[in-house]
Amino acid sequence: MRLLVLRGVDEVTVSSRSTVVIKSGNRVFERALRDVDAVLVVGSGIKISSSLPPVLALHGIPLSILAKGHVAVLLNPVGTKYNNYRALQYTLPKNKALAIALEYLKSRVRGMASIIRNRGGRLPALPEPPDPALYEDPARLESDIRSWEAAASNTLWDEVFKLLDPSAARELRERYGFAGRKPGHPDPLNKAISAMYAVLYTLSTKALVAAGLDPTYGFLHRTQYSVPLAFDYAEAFKPLAVEAALDLVNEEGLPTLSEDGDLDKDSLNKAMKRLYRYLSAKHRETGKTPYQQIHLKAFCLAKHLEGKCSREKLAFTWDKKRYIIHE
C-alpha cells in the first residue's frame, strides 16, 4: 500500500510532473509519484499548490482531503463516457444497483459481527435484510435498505463500544460527550475511525478507476459525496478500520487531538500503522491481503456488470481469525 499521508506540514506542491514536494518548517522533502498510489491530506492548515491536483490526475492518483470531519476525494473524470464498464454502470437498473450496494452493507454487518464474536462480546440479534427480488419499486427498496442498515448498524455499534477499555470509554463519555459513532463528533475515537475510513475511500477510488468504473456515480450514496460509488464500495472494508481503532485505543490509549480538532501527527501515524497491519494481513487459505481484495473486488464489480461475476462474490467479509497478522 503506497499511500502518502500528509499531516503537520506547511505546504505541498510539485517540482515537475513526477515529483511531490513537501515543505515543513525549514525542511523540504520530495516524493516520486511512481512510488505513490494515493495522497491523503489531513487537517485544514496545509497549503496545497494549485499545480498539485492536475499533476496527480495526470498519473491517475486520487487526492483526498480530510478536514473538520469531512472527506473529499478528487480525481480526474476525463473519459468516463468511453468505457464499456462505465456505460453499463450508468444504465444499470436501479433495483440491480441497490442490490449491489446491499451486498456491501451486508458484508460490513458480517465483518462487524465477527469483531464482536472474536473479542468475546455479545452478538446481538439483527434484523433480516430486505430481499431485492421481492421488490418492484426501487424507492421502496432503497427506503427499506436504509432502514435495515440503520437498525443493524446502531445495534452493532452499541456492542462494539462495549469492547473498549473501560477507562477510555469513561473518558470519551465524560470529557467528550461521546454517544456512539458520529462522523462529525469531536472525540478522538470518532476522529480516528474517520481518518481510517478516509484511507479506505481513497484506496477504493483508486481501485474502481483502475477497474474501469466511475467512482462519482454511486448506487446508494448520493451526489453530495465526491465519489459516491467509492463510499458504497468501501462499506465492505470498514470493519478493518473498526478493528484497528479498537486496538489503538485498548493498547495505546485515546489518540491525541491537535488544535484544529483532528488527530495530531503522532496519533495519525499510529492509526495508519494499525490500519496497514490489517490491510497487509494474508488470508490463511488464499494468501490474499485485504489491500489486494480492494482491487480484486473492484474488478469483480466491473465483471458483474457484464454478467461474468455473481453478486455473491462481489463483497469482502473481514474475519480476523482467517488472517495471518504480522506484528
Swiss-Prot record:
GO terms for biological process: defense response to virus; maintenance of CRISPR repeat elements. Its EC number is 3.1.-.-. Its cofactor is Mg(2+); Mn(2+). InterPro entries: Cas1 (IPR050646), CRISPR-assoc_Cas1 (IPR002729), CRISPR-assoc_Cas1_C (IPR042206). It comes from the Archaea. It is an enzyme of class 3 (hydrolase). Coiled coil: none annotated. Disulfide bonds: none annotated. CDD domains: Cas1_I-II-III. Mn(2+) binds at E149, H221, E235. Keywords: Antiviral defense, DNA-binding, Endonuclease, Hydrolase, Magnesium, Manganese, Metal-binding, Nuclease. GO terms for molecular function: DNA binding; endonuclease activity; metal ion binding. CRISPR (clustered regularly interspaced short palindromic repeat), is an adaptive immune system that provides protection against mobile genetic elements (viruses, transposable elements and conjugative plasmids). CRISPR clusters contain spacers, sequences complementary to antecedent mobile elements, and target invading nucleic acids. CRISPR clusters are transcribed and processed into CRISPR RNA (crRNA). Acts as a dsDNA endonuclease. Involved in the integration of spacer DNA into the CRISPR cassette. Homodimer, forms a heterotetramer with a Cas2 homodimer. PANTHER family: CRISPR-ASSOCIATED ENDONUCLEASE CAS1 1. Belongs to the CRISPR-associated endonuclease Cas1 family. HAMAP family: Cas1. This is CRISPR-associated endonuclease Cas1. It comes from Thermofilum pendens (strain DSM 2475 / Hrk 5). The gene is cas1.
